[in-house]
A protein has these predicted regions:
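Conserved AdoMet/S-adenosylmethionine-binding subsite of the radical SAM
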Residues: 58-233
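Short linear functional motifs in flexible/disordered or boundary regions
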Residues: 40, 44-47, 87, 183, ...
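C-terminal accessory regions of radical SAM enzymes
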Residues: 230-258
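N-terminal [4Fe-4S]-dependent radical SAM core
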Residues: 1-72
Length: 258
């Protein structure tokens, strides 16, 4: 069966969103403290954690054709779209789109990149969903956890830009960077600019992925996202048709409801 952007899928992580993932870059300027891709690259000796913010294109950036794929293609999944890789990103994305594929664009968006993409992808609007990630409305919290990424207001502005240009839009609040009440505020802050869905998920494996020097901040996240907080969040939004739950939330709900 052909999968739509928000079809129910079996699996966790990116498998909840797409059948296929693509990337053309190793490293990410956002340099998020909790990044799974940075942790994995360091673990498998592909790129030192301290070098993760230095972006480098991979051989996938040089492809000249792309096949028609069943389901949704998520591109990128382990890096972001930045001025460094924007030209290559647009070129590869167009290869994906011209074969009729549906493209899920996940990003902590920069205005300069979004403005270029909405022009470059004109005519493919029906095949694209922009899903922009933001975990808080608080600038200081965003700057701490995501030091190289755009601040929340710029990301919300990008939602407005994409929606106004006729594209479908979605938000990923994964990871949540605060607790129930601030996440509720964030949902309402972005809701006017969302055409499709808002996904919510916890910060995963923070003790494993975040440097030990930030242990106090990790412990605060764990407190703000304890089972009681998550259940309060779930009860608040459980009947909201726009809200979708990531696997980290579903696990808590299943366990607490047993």
């Amino acid at each position: 069966m052909t999968k739509n952007f928000d079809s129910t899928r079996i699996g966790t992580g990116t498998n909840e969103w797409a059948e296929v993932t693509e990337n053309i870059c190793r490293g990410c300027a956002n340099n998020c403290l909790y990044c799974y891709a940075a942790h994995s690259a360091n673990r498998f000796k592909l790129k030192d954690r301290g070098e993760w913010a230095k972006e480098e294109l991979t051989k996938r950036a040089d492809i000249i054709t792309y096949p028609a794929r069943e389901g949704v293609v998520m591109f990128p999944s382990s890096h972001d779209i930045t001025p460094y890789n924007l030209e290559a990103y647009i070129r590869v994305a167009e290869l994906i789109l011209v074969k009729g594929n549906r493209l899920l664009i996940v990003s902590k968006p920069r205005k300069e990149c979004v403005n270029e993409m909405i022009l470059a992808f004109a005519g493919f609007e029906d095949q694209i969903l922009f899903r922009f990630t933001m975990g808080t409305v608080v600038e200081s919290v965003s700057a701490f956890w995501e030091p190289g990424a755009p601040l929340p207001k710029e990301r919300r502005d990008c939602l407005d830009i994409a929606q106004s240009a006729g594209y479908r839009t979605s938000v990923s609040i994964e990871p949540m960077l605060q607790g129930f009440q601030m996440t509720e505020i964030l949902v309402e802050w972005v809701r006017p600019f969302v055409t499709d869905t808002i996904w919510i998920g916890k910060m995963n494996k923070a003790r494993l992925r975040v440097d030990n020097k930030h242990r106090a901040e990790v412990e605060l996240i764990e407190t703000l996202q304890n089972d009681k907080q998550i259940m309060s969040l779930y009860e608040w939004f459980k009947d909201d048709p726009v809200i979708r739950w990531k696997d980290s939330i579903k696990e808590v709900v299943a366990r607490m409801s047993a």
